């Protein structure tokens, strides 16, 4: 009986510490996204300041800048994957579904132009591809369905179509970030380019 009483407060305390740590990590990741959007070279000290914590707290959770960038990237990919999935890629006619999904994906991706540029420069192409898999895998059934219905090219493998869509989206992001193209005009161009490339005619 006494053992139960002594263990319960300890478990509650451990849960509180975990919850506090999770909140701290979330605030640091949010702060990193804000800071990096303004300055790709933002320091750990600046990120700590924005998160409202001391620098030691940032290093406690993320021992290196690379580990923080990895966590921020994982968070961003999760956000984009959620938006992509929420657009219901398995519903409707393939062409309409692709347009709907690309719009949803682009709307969320547009929050992360600078982060995408940072990761493109720091990671090998193969690693960048692997980390984007949670998003790109959602396009596979959609493209396969379009090929089966004859509205998407079937003479090229799905992997090629995925690489093409990813490359167009990344190029669009780079153009917006450079200021060469207005973001308001990119979305329709992105979708038209992807649909034209996939069309068998």
Where are these regions (language model features)?
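Basic, helix-initiating cap at the start of DNA-binding domains
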Residues: 1-38, 42-50, 67
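Amphipathic, non-transmembrane alpha-helical scaffold segments
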Residues: 21, 25, 73, 77, ...
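Solvent-exposed, amphipathic alpha-helical segments
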Residues: 31-38, 79-90, 108, 167-175
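Short hydrophobic/aromatic patch on the recognition helix
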Residues: 52-62
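Alpha-helical DNA-contacting segments of helix-turn-helix folds
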Residues: 62, 69-76
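Hydrophobic alpha-helical connector segments
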Residues: 71, 82-110, 124, 187
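Hydrophobic/aromatic-rich alpha-helical bundle segments in the mid-to-C-terminal region
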Residues: 116-121, 125, 129, 133, ...
